[in-house]
């Protein structure tokens, strides 16, 4: 699970530089079941 969370965090950080809100919305929708990880990343 750690690797999963890390990959999500990395892609979010990289994409955030381009479209923060849009990327965040997509990430939340794609990984909604992993809410705890999203809280840590956010």
Curated annotation (Swiss-Prot):
Region entry Disordered, spans: 1-23
Listed transmembrane segments: none
Pfam short name (any one): M-factor
Positions of the propeptide segment: 1-30, 40-42
Alphabetically ordered keywords of this record: Lipoprotein, Methylation, Pheromone, Prenylation, Secreted, Stress response
Cysteine methyl ester PTM positions: 39
One Gene Ontology cellular component annotation held by this UniProt entry: extracellular region
Any GO BP: positive regulation of pheromone response MAPK cascade
Functional summary from the UniProt entry: M-factor is a mating pheromone produced by M-type mating cells. All three mfm genes contribute to the production of M-factor.
Name of this protein: M-factor
Subcellular location: Secreted
GO terms of molecular function: mating pheromone activity
Induction summary: By nitrogen starvation. It is further induced by a pheromone signal. Its transcription is limited to M cells.
Superkingdom in the source lineage: Eukaryota
Lipidation residue positions, type S-farnesyl cysteine: 39
């Amino acid at each position: 699970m750690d690797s999963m969370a890390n990959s999500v965090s990395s892609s979010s950080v990289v994409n955030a530089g381009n479209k923060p809100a849009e990327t965040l919305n997509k990430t939340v929708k794609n990984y909604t079941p992993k809410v705890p990880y999203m809280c840590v990343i956010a």
